[in-house]
């Protein structure tokens, strides 16, 4: 497949990736909620870490020309990860914790999401860079 793909194909990739990402996000969220409960937004944290790791992998796989930028950036980066990751949910979870007066949980949530997601993206990038040398 060439780098020039039709607009219809681009929208189809975004839609397909989005449907898969949203479905997997819901599935993982339910698993984590059943496992760890609702006392802390672990489900949001988990999908954000997985999504950040996957974005790091994707970025380096495209940079190393292992994946096609037009297809995989659209399907996975925009579609799948756009629906899978949950920055808006992370923001709401943090705000609700603050409104409930649970400043410590809110601070921990913010710290964990930011630090672990950046670390996960870096790990994904590092793995591809190391494996492609």
UniProtKB/Swiss-Prot annotation:
It is found in: Cell inner membrane. Keywords: Cell inner membrane, Cell membrane, Ion channel, Ion transport, Membrane, Metal-binding, Sodium, Transmembrane, Transmembrane helix, Transport. It is a multi-pass membrane protein. Na(+) binds at residues 82, 85. Na(+) is not transported, but it plays an essential structural role and its presence is essential for fluoride channel function. One of its GO terms (cellular component) is plasma membrane. Its main location: membrane. InterPro entries: FluC (IPR003691). It catalyses: fluoride(in) = fluoride(out). GO terms for molecular function: fluoride channel activity; metal ion binding. It holds the Pfam family CRCB. One of its GO terms (biological process) is cellular detoxification of fluoride. The keyword DNA repair does not apply. It comes from the Bacteria. The chain crosses the membrane at residues 4-24, 39-59, 78-98, 108-128. PANTHER family: FLUORIDE EXPORT PROTEIN 1-RELATED. NCBIfam families: crcB. Fluoride-specific ion channel. Important for reducing fluoride concentration in the cell, thus reducing its toxicity. HAMAP family: FluC (MF_00454). Belongs to the fluoride channel Fluc/FEX (TC 1.A.43) family. This is Fluoride-specific ion channel FluC. It comes from Colwellia psychrerythraea (strain 34H / ATCC BAA-681).
